[in-house]
């Protein structure tokens, strides 16, 4: 085990942390907004909305994330009308394609988490809101979503961890995040074991921080709720 190489490589690999966190943050924010919309469509009585959400979730969850990334970054470029449209300004950028892929992925998984949280809301709470004269939108904002967040947070925390690990795939499209830098170092040093141990340790540290944050958020939500 070449510890000096591991030490030197650590300071190079951590330079990929900002890009990794940028991708995770943007994908999570956009994905969460999209997930709420998809979840609302999924529980809607409108068959068109419900079916669209169902097939969106089924397609994203049923196909490999790497395949989705290849389709968006390489596949869409094969269509002339896309290359000649304003979309090409965005789709030729590997960072945009990586964020878009992860956004769609986390939206599909998070939508099911949110849907489960919505369906766990006891009918009595909704009936109480109706009896107080709350509109449907007000009940959603004041009753359904707060309870949904509390119920869905543990599972959503796991989704965040999966998102961090999934960012390693975007190195395939030449982005120099943690794994991308690690692969570059390996190509020069031919020491995959040492370098991947360092990269894996960095991922572990990031996910440890996320786990502790989620645990704290769970405590605050449960501590402030009426038991």
Regions found by a protein language model. Give the residues of each.
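Transmembrane alpha-helices and adjacent helix-loop boundaries
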Residues: 1-227
């Amino acid at each position: 085990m070449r510890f000096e190489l591991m030490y030197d490589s650590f300071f190079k690999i951590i330079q990929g942390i900002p890009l990794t966190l940028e991708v995770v943050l943007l994908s999570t924010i956009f994905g969460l907004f999209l997930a709420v919309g998809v979840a609302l469509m999924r529980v809607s009585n409108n068959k068109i909305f419900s079916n669209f959400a169902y097939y969106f979730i089924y397609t994203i969850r049923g196909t490999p994330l790497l395949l989705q990334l290849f389709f968006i970054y390489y596949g869409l470029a094969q269509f002339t009308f896309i290359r000649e449209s304003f979309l090409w300004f965005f789709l030729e950028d590997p960072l945009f394609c990586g964020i878009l892929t992860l956004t769609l992925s986390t939206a599909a998984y998070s939508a099911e988490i949110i849907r489960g949280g919505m369906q766990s809301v006891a009918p009595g709470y909704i009936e109480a809101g109706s009896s107080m004269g709350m509109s449907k939108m007000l009940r959603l904002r004041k009753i359904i979503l707060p309870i949904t967040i509390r119920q869905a947070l543990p599972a959503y925390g796991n989704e965040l961890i999966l998102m961090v690990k999934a960012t390693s795939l975007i190195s395939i499209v030449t982005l120099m995040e943690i794994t991308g830098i690690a692969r570059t170092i390996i190509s020069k040093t031919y020491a995959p074991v040492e370098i991947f141990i360092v990269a894996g340790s960095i991922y572990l540290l990031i996910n440890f921080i996320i786990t502790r944050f989620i645990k704290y958020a769970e405590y605050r939500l449960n501590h402030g709720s009426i038991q």
